[in-house]
């Protein structure tokens, strides 16, 4: 990949553009308590996110990154349903964009890049979140965790984007904060841009060997905007 080749940039949402853990933690805590289990803290939930809501709730009920195999499917489904309700009720008021996110998206949009969102978050929550934080209009495609049969690190969403926009893997860049994002990019054959903040279960993003590592989303402009 050379910078001049990139046409489409796919972004993860939670932990990349948006710190959503404060709201997710409130909902997870309420859901686990509602089914008679101990509650969870924001610190715990920071460690549990990144693999979709079903996994988040399984971890919260288990109080561990490893889900307790003795938890019944019925209990997990009940807790997940409650979690969705509680999360909707938060109104995403505690979530906030990371620094430089809006300015960076605006600059990329104005420069003519196609921007897409590829998140493991349930699709039904995504449009409101994007709208609320004033970034909905930058994205041509918004793909949630249930848009396809498999979530990241499966490359199905990235492959779909390449097919839709008729581009090659060398023309796409995946931007994310977790191992799943970097692996999805590798599995799709495209380059990846890993952010050091966000949610990656305490593991440095560099361990997943993205093509670029950055502390701020604004550094993405240095990678893709080649000065005239």
UniProtKB/Swiss-Prot annotation:
Pathway: Organic acid metabolism; glycolate biosynthesis; glycolate from 2-phosphoglycolate: step 1/1. One of its GO terms (biological process) is DNA repair. Its EC number is 3.1.3.18. Its cofactor is Mg(2+). One of its GO terms (cellular component) is cytosol. Keywords: Carbohydrate metabolism, Hydrolase, Magnesium, Metal-binding. It catalyses: 2-phosphoglycolate + H2O = glycolate + phosphate. Belongs to the HAD-like hydrolase superfamily. CbbY/CbbZ/Gph/YieH family. Specifically catalyzes the dephosphorylation of 2-phosphoglycolate. Is involved in the dissimilation of the intracellular 2-phosphoglycolate formed during the DNA repair of 3'-phosphoglycolate ends, a major class of DNA lesions induced by oxidative stress. This is Phosphoglycolate phosphatase. It comes from Vibrio vulnificus (strain YJ016). The lineage of its organism: Bacteria, Pseudomonadati, Pseudomonadota, Gammaproteobacteria, Vibrionales. The gene is gph.
């Amino acid at each position: 990949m050379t910078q001049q080749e990139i046409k489409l940039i796919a972004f993860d949402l939670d932990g990349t553009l948006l710190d959503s853990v404060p709201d997710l933690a409130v909902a997870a805590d309420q859901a686990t308590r509602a089914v008679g289990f101990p509650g969870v803290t924001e610190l715990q939930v920071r460690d549990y996110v990144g693999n979709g809501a079903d996994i988040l709730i399984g971890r919260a009920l288990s109080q561990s990154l490893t889900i307790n195999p003795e938890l019944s499917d019925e209990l997990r489904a009940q807790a997940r349903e409650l979690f969705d309700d509680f999360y909707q009720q938060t109104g995403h008021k505690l979530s906030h964009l990371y620094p430089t996110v809006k300015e960076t998206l605006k600059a990329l949009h104005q420069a003519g890049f196609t921007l897409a969102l590829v998140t493991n978050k349930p699709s039904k929550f995504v449009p409101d979140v994007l709208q609320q934080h004033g970034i909905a209009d930058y994205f041509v495609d918004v793909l949630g965790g249930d848009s396809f049969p498999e979530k990241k690190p499966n490359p199905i969403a990235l492959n779909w984007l390449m097919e839709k926009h008729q581009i090659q893997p060398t023309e796409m860049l995946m931007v994310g904060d977790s191992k799943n994002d970097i692996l999805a990019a590798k599995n799709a054959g495209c380059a990846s841009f890993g952010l050091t903040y966000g949610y990656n279960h305490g593991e440095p993003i560099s361990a997943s060997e993205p093509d670029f590592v950055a502390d701020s989303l604004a550094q993405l402009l240095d990678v893709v905007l080649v000065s005239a």
